[in-house]
Amino acid sequence: MAGVGAGQDVPVVLSVLGRPPTGRVPGVLAACDGSDGSLWALDRAMTEAELFGLPLYVLAVVNPAPAGYPPGMAELVQESVETLVESMADGLRRAVATVLRQRVRPFAGEMSLHVVLGNVIEVLLEASARQHTLVVGTRGNGGFARLLLGSVSSAAVHHAACPVLVVPAPPGP
């Protein structure tokens, strides 16, 4: 299996229908929003994928604005969503590159990046039906808040169709 080094580009697959790509081998699905907690979880997801010899699917979700715009506004909103998707894809590439740079050894597995339009929780729960493991981070705000799960990780733990690994943020200074 070819590994992915810090200097290599990983293609981003855009799923505009609000669904993660189907027909793929079950693997480790990592939710990534670019936050420090999600980067920490992504690193752990890379390790899990390597340990099990599974592909790693890194997923970012863009939640489009609600429908029902006045005449003339729909086109502006569509342009905004397209810009947001492009921005999220760039951010996802940067997030993966950051984690790859910080790893002691290069990621020795197969990885693909996916940007999906839809509700974050709904997309993750749907995607979990086809995966070996779902990896998510916590809110990781420190102190008491660090003991609480965010809404996404909480929904994943309670409703995902596969095992869920919730990765707490590393202890801060």
Sequence positions of predicted segments:
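Small/aliphatic-rich secondary-structure junction motif
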Residues: 17-78, 127
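Short glycine/serine/threonine/alanine-rich loop segments
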Residues: 48, 52-55, 109, 133, ...
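Short, flexible loop segments at boundaries between secondary-structure elements
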Residues: 162-173
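Hydrophobic structural packing positions in well-ordered secondary structure
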Residues: 28, 45, 124, 135, ...
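Acidic, proline/glycine-rich short linear motifs
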Residues: 3-20, 60-91, 173
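Structural beta-alpha unit
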Residues: 1-24, 37, 98-134, 171-173
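Glycine-rich, Arg-bearing micro-motifs that act as flexible, cationic patches
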Residues: 133-158, 173
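General small-molecule cofactor/ligand-binding pocket signal
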Residues: 57-59, 112-116, 165
